[in-house]
Regions:
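Rossmann-like dinucleotide-binding domain that binds NAD(P)(H)
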Residues: 1-51, 57-62, 131
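Surface loops and adjacent helix of pleckstrin homology
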Residues: 57, 82, 158
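Hydrophobic alpha-helical segments typical of transmembrane helices
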Residues: 66, 112-116, 120
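Short polybasic amphipathic segments
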Residues: 68, 84-94
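Active-site loop of classical SDR/Rossmann-like NAD(P)-dependent oxidoreductases
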Residues: 103-113
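C-terminal helix-rich "cap/oligomerization" subdomain common to oxidoreductases
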Residues: 118-176
Length: 176
């Protein structure tokens, strides 16, 4: 969200297998028909002119979880897996060796819910709003449309850029 709303997307998609087998849970071993692309590569253009590339895939035999890299004019930041809410950042620049920035945050998965509850109680807009969620779904639907048509697709929705949590924000702080 800190990059702001997405204006348009382009994408390609593919499906390598017509059926898949559920790998875990109560339905493990059950085969099902694949009805959507299982690999999507997308280009996103933000309203402010920035861009991003994304790959979403179930087609790799390599088991891993996501990672995030942000490249800017001075270097690249490699973030740890956002699914675990912990880990170190690594900053790469052209003029020096990579620098590891040790994580100081340990807010975890409940951060958004805690922030929502505090915002409701304070009567202020929440950061992870329904409008933001709708915009994310609109982006994903636009990616699928772009992959299907082979054309750039305008993302119809927009959303205000959410403010970052303030320095020192503590989800465990007693606020009642």
């Amino acid at each position: 969200q800190n990059f702001g709303p997405v204006a348009r997307v382009s994408a390609t998609g593919s499906t390598s297998r017509q059926t898949r087998v559920i790998g875990s849970g109560p339905r493990a071993g059950e085969e099902f028909a694949v009805r959507v692309p299982t690999h999507v590569s997308a280009l996103l253009e933000f309203e402010d002119g920035g861009s991003a590339q994304c790959v979403f895939s179930f087609q790799s035999a390599l088991r891993r979880t996501g990672f995030l890299e942000i490249a800017g004019t001075e270097g690249t930041i490699v973030f740890p897996d956002p699914n675990y809410f912990e880990g170190d950042l690594v900053v790469h620049t052209e003029s020096s060796e990579p620098v590891t920035v040790h994580s100081v945050a340990d807010a975890g998965r409940g951060t958004g819910v805690v922030e929502l509850a505090r915002a409701i109680r304070a009567g202020v807009p929440e950061r992870a709003s329904g409008e933001q969620a709708f915009h994310v779904v609109d982006i994903m639907e636009s990616m699928l449309e772009a992959a299907d048509t082979g054309q750039w697709v305008t993302v119809e929705s927009t959303v205000e850029r959410a403010k970052s949590l303030p320095d020192g924000w503590d989800p465990r702080e007693a606020t009642l």
